[in-house]
Amino acid sequence: FPDVWIMGEVIHGDYPAIVRQSGMDSLTQYELWKAIWSSLESANFYELDWSLKRHNEFLESFAPQTFVGNHDVTRIASRVGDAGASLAMTVLFTVGGVPSIYYGDEQAFRGVKEDRMGGDDAVRPAFPASPDDLPGTGEWMYRLIQGLIGIRRRNPWLTHAMTTPVTVDNRRYAYDAVGHGGERLHVELSLDPAPHAVVSGSDGTVLMRVQHGD
């Protein structure tokens, strides 16, 4: 089945070895998932920088499946708020890998996973019968993700892009996403005075400004 893409859910282990030995195309990048929300929650971009260096190592052998939410974890908007979630999405779509969106995160759904019977229910709600029945409060996130997907489609090399840090401190992080052919995007993340991000092309042209208040 040459046109089938096979991805496995793996939490811990030697990611490259598992991909190589299993024959899978990709697996879940839980290390990066954790670093994205944790660095925003604790105002510690050094954690994200460390994880992205590890992510570069994985990209040398396969393109990890990247995410900021799934069926087993607290939703990103509940974890870091709407403003933090907008930065998390920016990182997701501007680093190497195969990004995916967990249903409802594109509408900034909230839900906290609990360690009890039925504790996943809050992060696995039923969709309304029609998009018209959505509350509308998450439209801003839908539009943000549309814009980020547009950037990624225009820059398909991002799937295998390496991340090069430019500025790193607790509350500000700037990096370049660099393609194998020399292509480049520049991304700036900041928590001050409020969480915001800027995505620029290699010529300095601003492609997107990201900011959303809780």
Tell where the protein language model's regions lie, with residue ranges:
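Short, acidic/polar
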Residues: 83-89
